[in-house]
Swiss-Prot record:
Pathway entry: Cell wall biogenesis; peptidoglycan biosynthesis
Annotated protein name in UniProt: UDP-N-acetylmuramate--L-alanine ligase
EC id: 6.3.2.8
Annotated PANTHER family: UDP-N-ACETYLMURAMATE--L-ALANINE LIGASE (PTHR43445:SF3), UDP-N-ACETYLMURAMATE--L-ALANINE LIGASE-RELATED (PTHR43445)
Keyword rRNA-binding included in the entry's annotation: no
Main location: cytoplasm
Pfam families linked: Mur_ligase, Mur_ligase_C, Mur_ligase_M
One GO MF term attached to the UniProt entry: ATP binding
Gene from which this protein is expressed: murC
Cysteine-cysteine disulfides: none
GO BP: cell division; cell wall organization; peptidoglycan biosynthetic process; regulation of cell shape
Alphabetically ordered keywords of this record: ATP-binding, Cell cycle, Cell division, Cell shape, Cell wall biogenesis/degradation, Cytoplasm, Ligase, Nucleotide-binding, Peptidoglycan synthesis
Catalytic activity reported: UDP-N-acetyl-alpha-D-muramate + L-alanine + ATP = UDP-N-acetyl-alpha-D-muramoyl-L-alanine + ADP + phosphate + H(+)
Length: 493
């Protein structure tokens, strides 16, 4: 953004007085890094710290942001405010130093709320689908020439980044319920895609507490705001009488205000109709597979319709939607000959889904789009607590693939829980389905173990939220040894 554009932006969005230097602890997280990038482009001095370099820190470094790859009290020197990720413990030396120096320490969502204060905020929340829905809303607004600012939890492929500073009054953000911090946000429009039991440690294991927090989030809307809610979700349906705001519902249900009909899927493309109240029916061609993505698109259309975006821009944006990183992400179609000497090809898909509902949606999209392919899944459970809380659901959904290779649980900083392990999960799947999952205790052995299982026309699904994304890239770039016959861009043009 040039100085003229920034000056124009300042007429709508005043700068934060007395704030010149903002320090982020845990800056390598997608949400943290996105906010840091937007603030850097607004002209603030940004520094940050994290324990390891990643794609986010590399991108921020290219913007000239100073990043320390260690935590030390000197890192916060001269900061006006310190922003912390919920993953950072209270005894972090930088937090302690900030308190001693009387430097304000705030949560990520508090800074996101500050970005939203003088903007037209659109917040997308829900247990599943919020990253993709955020990307769809941002894509539609960009297609319409509205130049929004966005902050997303995943890479928006068309933009090549998680976040971007726009010149308009619109701010589109992913609202994270994992630590309940989304309650700080005060948008004008809010989407809730669904509500399921997840991150229950945050909510003291009380599902009613989780539901009430979502209601409180929606009641942050002004009386003239609007809640966009998926009526297919039974929890949301039961909560409707408790939500005292203007509501637009969407879904496959007959009583939805924006109703999906005639859904079909052909490989990576979804086709369906959207019936809207007092509006023309939209014939959608969506460049993303699965009924779950049709729901995400319906939510995005509801927001765009509310704002008066022309149908032409909506249709174009969804037709050319390039998706988000690690969401049914096709890394290529590879020949088998260099892998195990067999003839034919295999398709490699990388997917972030780590909750049973998300895994089931991925499997269903694969089965519908490619009914003749065997599904070979490499799965990495994420967190001991989630594996424990949703154990039976994991057993059920992981029994639905043809071949399963199971990695060890990615702890995400949690301590092990007795009797909760990938080995136990494999045993339970074996007892439940009589399938024979393969436990992989060493990532370096995965390529050879996988090669023994592969046959012509297989689809390999690399599934999970830990460090398994690196496994997928390694398989694509190194272990398969040859470039794919079809690059991923061919599916997301």
């Amino acid at each position: 953004m040039n100085q003229k554009q920034l000056t124009k932006l300042r007429t709508m969005v005043p700068e934060m007085k007395r704030v010149r230097h903002i320090h982020f602890i845990g800056i390598g997280g997608a949400g943290m890094g996105g906010i840091a990038e937007v603030l850097a482009n607004e002209g603030y001095k940004i520094t940050g710290s994290d324990l390891a370099e990643n794609v986010v820190t590399q991108q921020l470094s290219h913007l000239g942001i100073c990043i320390f790859f260690h935590h030390h009290r000197d890192n916060v020197k001269n900061a006006s405010v310190v922003v912390v990720s919920s993953a950072i413990p209270e005894d972090n030396p930088e937090i302690l130093a900030a308190h001693e120096a009387r430097i304000p320490v705030i949560q990520r969502a508090e800074m996101l709320a500050e970005l939203m204060r003088f903007r037209h905020g659109i917040a997308i929340a829900g247990t599943h689908g919020k990253t993709t829905t955020t990307a769809m809303v941002a894509s539609i607004y960009a297609q319409a020439g509205l130049d929004p600012t966005f902050v997303n939890g995943g890479l928006i492929k068309a933009a090549g980044k998680h976040a971007q500073l726009g010149s308009s009054r619109y701010l589109i953000v992913e609202a994270d319920e994992s630590d309940a911090s989304f309650i700080h946000l005060q948008p004008l429009v809010a989407i809730v895609t669904n509500i399921e039991a997840d991150h229950m440690d945050t909510y003291q294991g009380n599902f009613e507490h989780l539901k009430q927090t979502f209601i409180n989030f929606l009641h942050n809307l002004p009386f003239y705001g609007r809640a966009i809610l998926c009526i297919d979700d039974q929890v949301i349906r039961t909560l409707l009488p408790r939500i005292a705001r203007h509501i637009t519902t969407y879904g496959f249900s007959e009583d939805a205000d924006i109703k999906i009909t005639g859904y079909e899927q052909k490989e990576f493309t979804s086709y369906f109709m959207l019936e809207r109240v007092h509006k023309p029916i939209l014939k959608i061609q969506l460049n993303a597979p699965g009924r779950h993505n049709a729901l995400n698109a319906a939510a995005a259309v509801a927001v765009a319709t509310e704002e008066g975006v022309e149908d032409e821009h909506i249709l174009q944006a969804l037709s050319f939607f390039q998706g988000t990183g690690r969401r049914f992400d096709c890394l290529g179609i590879f020949p088998l000959q260099p892998v195990n000497g067999q003839q034919g090809e295999v398709m490699l898909i990388d997917d972030y889904g780590h909750h049973p509902t998300e895994v089931a949606a991925t499997i269903k999209a694969a089965r519908v789009g490619w009914p003749t392919k065997r599904l070979v899944m490499i799965f990495q459970p994420h967190r001991y607590s989630r594996t424990r809380d949703l154990y039976d659901d994991f057993v059920n959904v992981l029994s639905q693939v043809d071949i399963l290779l199971m990695l060890e649980i990615y702890s995400a900083g949690e301590s092990p829980i007795p009797d909760i392990s990938s080995c136990a999960l494999c045993d339970s799947i074996r007892d439940f389905s009589h399938r024979m999952p393969i436990l992989v205790t060493d990532h370096e052995k995965l390529p050879s173990l996988l090669a023994k299982q592969l046959k012509e026309n297989d689809m390999v699904l690399v599934q999970g939220a830990g460090n398994i994304g690196k496994v997928a890239r390694t398989l694509a770039e190194c272990e398969l040894k040859v470039p794919p016959l079809i690059q991923k861009e061919s599916h997301y043009a």
